Design a protein with these regions (language model features):
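Conserved glycine-rich cofactor-binding loop
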Residues: 9, 16-17
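Conserved glycine-rich Rossmann-like NAD(P)H-binding loop of the short-chain dehydrogenase/reductase
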Residues: 30-47
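The beta1-alpha1 cofactor-binding region of Rossmann-like NAD(H)/NADP(H)-dependent oxidoreductases
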Residues: 62-72, 104
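Substrate-binding pocket helix/loop in short-chain dehydrogenase/reductase
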Residues: 98-99, 103-108
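Active-site helix of classical SDR
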Residues: 122, 158
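Residue(s) in the substrate-gating loop at a strand-loop-helix junction
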Residues: 142
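SDR active-site lid
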Residues: 174-240
């Protein structure tokens, strides 16, 4: 087994379920020391108790949509955060609402969670990484970060923002000759509860699963791909059949518009 992850401090948001939970389990098995973050402290404690070398892992309950909570965590756990070798921005929230019906509150919550939360944590870990001249920042995006899709205007905007931010950060770090790896992950359909928690026009949860996700990748498969790509220091990786739409939009924009216009939501 590779020693790549041995004793690395890996901070994972959205760690209590889905891809985040799968990453926690697999990286703990590889010898990483995990900082588990999500809003569900009880679930985090339950997960941590099942990990190998459980005493080496830490729990940091966090609502990434709340700047005050983030700032309190950064102050109270400053030493721990300064030690982070790998940050995985996995926490996120999706959307199922027509643009003209979506409330401003729901749009702001999506941006706070998916963009401002991720960038706040990124800026928190960067000083330690830059001082050591080593580190990795991995952010979960979506094919919606490469093209717009019906019922996901604010979600897509948040993911486009993630791409612009981290592409710019990568260029800045490269220009400064810093050995800090930036990777964007664009998974297509993954069998998680993300659609269940997606926001409707009034900001309430959809509270039902999209049937298409049932045939998607498992979180375990997705986590394995992310880990492998991180070890190879990839800049951007794709999973699932949806990646074909990225190329269609780039080279056949008329066909792409025809495809998304005919899209029927679950």
């Amino acid at each position: 087994m590779s020693n790549f992850w041995k004793d690395k401090v890996v901070w994972i948001t959205g760690a209590s379920s889905g891809i985040g939970e799968a990453l926690v389990k697999q990286l703990a098995e590889k010898g990483a020391r995990i900082i588990l973050s999500s809003r569900n402290a009880d679930k985090l404690a339950e997960l941590k108790a099942k990990l190998p070398n459980t005493e080496e892992h830490s729990i940091l309950p966090l609502d990434v949509s709340n700047e005050n909570i983030i700032n309190q965590a950064l102050i109270s756990r400053k030493e721990l955060i300064n030690s982070v070798d790998v940050l995985i921005n996995n926490a996120g929230i999706s959307q199922r609402a027509l643009t003209w019906e979506a409330s401003r509150e729901s749009e702001r919550l999506i941006m706070e969670t998916n963009f401002f939360g991720a960038t706040a944590l990124t800026k928190a870990v960067l000083p330690g990484m830059m001082k050591r001249n080593a580190g990795s920042i991995i952010s979960l995006s979506s094919p919606a970060g490469a093209f717009g899709f019906p019922l996901r205007s604010s979600y897509s905007a948040s993911k486009h923002a993630i791409h612009g931010y981290f592409d710019s950060l990568r260029a800045e770090l490269d220009a400064a000759k810093k050995n800090i790896h930036i990777m964007l992950v664009l998974p297509g359909r993954v069998s998680t509860n993300m659609s269940y928690n997606a926001l409707k026009q009034d900001g309430s949860k959809q509270a039902e699963a999209d049937q298409r996700l049932a045939s998607g990748l498992s979180p375990d498969e997705c986590a394995k791909g992310i880990i492998k790509a991180a070890e190879k220091r990839k800049a951007e990786i794709y999973f699932g059949r949806e990646q074909i739409l990225i190329y269609i939009k780039r080279y056949l924009p008329g066909l792409f518009r025809s495809i998304v216009t005919k899209f029927k939501p679950d």
